[in-house]
Structures are given as structure tokens and as C-alpha cells.
């Protein structure tokens, strides 16, 4: 009989650990690249919902679903940045933006709920909302500090359409003639207001048009994602309230439904165009997810529903997004302040990004000319002649 060498018990332990690690690594291979898509697959399996449903597409199947917006630790006081009041500060850099803000007056309404006043809404107020010409939060509870309006509509996804109708009716009744454009955003949307106005400057508020992240199901000409925010011209708001909303053959009278899709259906039936919000090079300006989702190559499964929904092709990676991006969605309060810092406070020393205004032009005319040159290729009013500004 052969004399086999005696194996130490420790060797068996080491072999077991090594085998376990190997199995663990193999089992994880191929899953990390599309981590978001994996979570969605699990979600669909648990819900028995393999298809994208018209009344649920904007939420349950998102890689950054509402329940994943990490605002559990957001009950901190609004953050105030330093004033940058030094010889190398940003002082004087907003002259053009300030002039455009006088010309393109945007009323912002932010959809929220009483449970989110302290977790989200106050951080929206402390960051981008202050750059609207005027803003208000639409909720189920009044809050003079925000301020928030009580729409007397129940909370929950099943009532988003009712809230949206009520919010636009309130704005029509109180602010129609005081502003040019009317932006709807969520309390986890981050908006670069200067870039929104820059895009809108090429258009007249008398055009029946709305802009946002354009999706293609459910309508002929497209509709706009609710989470990325969408903006209606004054004429679009008038048509929605005066013509579409009172007519049950044009607008759903129910309280439920996908708010963004229902809005798109109503507007299309009264001749309001779903505009092309891309820049002249085809880069997108309204983003329905956080920056990481769009900027990181391979972040999301190519079979993910978004790629079938988007009206215009969108690259995944650094070429996705316009240098004049307008919005991102699923932005938690911490990320909101990070974006605020990166956009409005951080600057590379020695790099001058000033826009040169010719001596024979006004600031607003120069901005208008650049805005027209940056319009999307599918612009609904592209043939509209240049007007005096």
C-alpha cells in the first residue's frame, strides 16, 4: 500500500476558503457592469411585471427609482456657500445671464409632498430654485416658508396627474401674464436655469410648444419625461387650460395615469408641439437620470427600457450631454449641493470662458444669436425668422 503524505487540517481550511472565494468571484462576473439593470430585473421578477406599463414606466422600472433617492439623511439645514468675494471671484460673470433672465421670465413649480418638505424641498429652494424668476412648491400641505401651495389633492403616484392639472390651473389663474415660460420639475430634479433660459431665448412664448426629455410612446409627436422637467410656453399653457383640460375627449379627467404621458397627449391634441431640446450637435440637454447614469459608458444594459423610449438617439458616455445641459433627475440633497458647487463655485484658474459681445451689438442680441445657432436639428419653429430682441 502506498504511503500518502499526511495532510494538515489547516490545509483543508485554506482549500475551502480558496474554493469559496473562487465561486464567489465567478458568480459575480458579468453582473457589476449593469448593476442598475440587475436591480430592475429583480424588481420586475418580484412584481411579475416583465413589460413596461404605460402607467408605471416613469417610476418602477427606473434604475434610480424614487425609493433609491438617498435622502434618509437629508434633514440637515440648507447649506450656504461662501460669497466668493475676492479679487479672483465670480463677481461680474453673470451679466449676460442677468440680462437673459429679464427677457426670458420663467415661473417654476416644483412637485413635492408634505413628507418631503424638510427632506427635499428646502434643499431645492437653497440651490437651483432661487434662480427662477419666481417659484412655488405644489403639495398637499401649505408651507409659507418654502412656499408651498396646498392643492387639496391626495398624495401618492396615483394622484400625480391630478396634482399636475391642479398646479397648472393655479398658475394659469394667478401668473399667466406675468411670465413667459412655465417649468414643472420634481423635488429631486436639479435645473441649471441659465441654460434653460439660453435654450428658450431662441423661441417666443407665443409659440405653442413645450420642451423636455422627449419620449416617443403613446403620442405621435412625442411627450416629455416628468422627472427631467418640462417647460411650457405661455401659449401652450393657455391651450392646455382653456381648450384641452375642459374637454374629456382631449384630456383624461381621471386623477391617475402617467402624468407626463397624459400631459403629452393633451397638448398634442390641441396643436402644441413637443420641441427638440437638443443642441445643434444633437447632444441632449434634459437628462432623466443622475449624471453618472448618462456619463459612464456601459453603466446601463443596452436592453434597458429607456433606449426604446427616447425619441432621439442618445450616446452613453461623455458624448451624451450638451455643454449647456439643463437638468438631471433622481438627485438627492447631497448631490444637489455637489452640483451647485461644481457649476457655480468651482472654476479652473486662468481659463476665460467669457462670451465676447461685439461693439455694435447688445448683450441680449448676442445671446439670442448664439441661442438660435444652438437649436436642435428637429426644431419645430426652425424656419421662424430672426426677430428684434
Curated annotation (Swiss-Prot):
Chief location of this protein within or outside the cell: membrane
Transmembrane parts of this sequence: 7-27
Disulfide partners: 108-132, 251-266, 320-321
Residue positions with a glycan: 84-85, 152, 360
Tissue: Ubiquitously expressed throughout development. Present in all cells.
Any matching Pfam family: Fringe
EC number: 2.4.1.122
Pathway(s) where this gene product acts: Protein modification; protein glycosylation
Protein name from the UniProt record: Glycoprotein-N-acetylgalactosamine 3-beta-galactosyltransferase 1
Region (Disordered): 49-71
A GO BP annotation: protein glycosylation
Keyword Protein biosynthesis set for record: no
Cofactor(s) this protein requires: Mn(2+)
Residues binding a glycoprotein: 305
Taxonomic source organism: Caenorhabditis elegans
Amino acid at each position: 500500500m502506498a504511503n500518502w503524505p499526511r495532510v494538515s487540517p489547516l490545509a483543508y481550511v485554506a482549500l475551502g476558503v480558496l474554493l469559496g472565494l473562487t465561486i464567489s468571484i465567478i458568480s459575480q462576473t458579468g453582473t457589476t457592469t449593469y448593476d442598475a439593470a440587475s436591480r430592475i430585473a429583480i424588481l420586475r421578477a418580484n412584481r411579475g411585471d416583465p413589460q413596461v406599463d404605460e402607467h408605471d414606466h416613469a417610476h418602477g422600472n427606473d434604475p434610480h427609482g424614487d425609493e433609491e433617492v438617498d435622502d434618509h439623511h437629508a434633514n440637515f439645514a440648507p447649506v450656504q456657500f461662501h460669497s466668493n468675494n475676492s479679487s479672483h471671484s465670480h463677481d461680474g460673470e453673470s451679466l449676460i445671464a442677468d440680462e437673459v433672465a429679464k427677457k426670458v421670465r420663467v415661473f417654476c413649480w416644483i412637485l413635492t409632498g408634505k413628507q418631503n418638505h424638510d427632506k427635499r424641498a428646502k434643499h431645492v429652494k437653497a440651490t437651483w430654485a432661487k434662480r427662477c424668476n419666481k417659484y412655488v412648491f405644489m403639495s398637499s400641505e401649505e408651507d409659507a416658508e418654502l412656499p408651498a401651495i396646498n392643492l387639496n389633492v391626495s398624495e401618492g403616484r396615483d394622484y400625480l396627474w391630478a396634482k399636475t392639472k391642479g398646479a397648472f390651473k393655479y398658475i394659469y389663474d394667478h401668473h399667466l401674464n406675468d411670465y413667459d415660460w412655465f417649468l414643472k420639475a420634481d423635488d429631486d430634479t436639479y435645473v441649471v436655469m441659465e441654460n434653460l433660459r439660453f435654450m428658450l431665448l431662441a423661441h417666443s412664448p407665443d409659440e405653442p410648444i413645450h420642451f423636455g426629455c422627449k419620449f416617443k410612446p403613446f403620442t405621435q409627436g412625442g411627450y416629455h419625461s416628468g422627472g427631467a422637467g418640462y417647460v411650457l410656453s405661455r401659449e401652450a399653457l393657455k391651450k392646455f387650460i382653456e381648450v384641452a383640460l375642459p374637454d374629456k375627449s382631449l384630456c383624461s379627467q381621471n386623477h391617475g395615469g402617467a402624468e407626463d404621458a397624459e400631459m403629452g397627449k393633451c397638448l398634442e391634441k390641441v396643436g402644441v408641439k413637443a420641441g427638440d431640446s437638443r443642441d445643434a450637435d444633437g447632444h441632449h440637454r434634459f437628462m432623466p437620470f443622475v449624471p453618472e447614469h448618462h456619463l459612464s459608458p456601459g453603466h446601463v444594459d443596452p436592453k434597458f427600457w429607456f433606449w426604446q423610449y427616447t425619441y432621439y438617439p442618445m450616446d452613453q458616455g461623455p458624448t451624451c450631454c450638451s455643454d449647456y445641459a439643463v437638468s438631471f433627475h433622481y438627485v438627492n440633497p447631497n448631490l444637489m449641493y455637489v452640483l451647485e458647487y461644481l457649476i457655480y463655485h468651482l472654476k479652473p484658474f486662468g481659463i476665460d470662458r467669457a462670451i465676447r459681445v461685439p461693439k455694435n451689438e447688445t448683450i441680449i442680441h448676442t445671446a439670442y444669436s448664439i441661442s438660435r445657432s444652438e437649436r436642435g436639428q428637429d426644431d419645430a419653429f426652425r424656419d421662424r425668422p430672426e426677430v428684434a430682441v
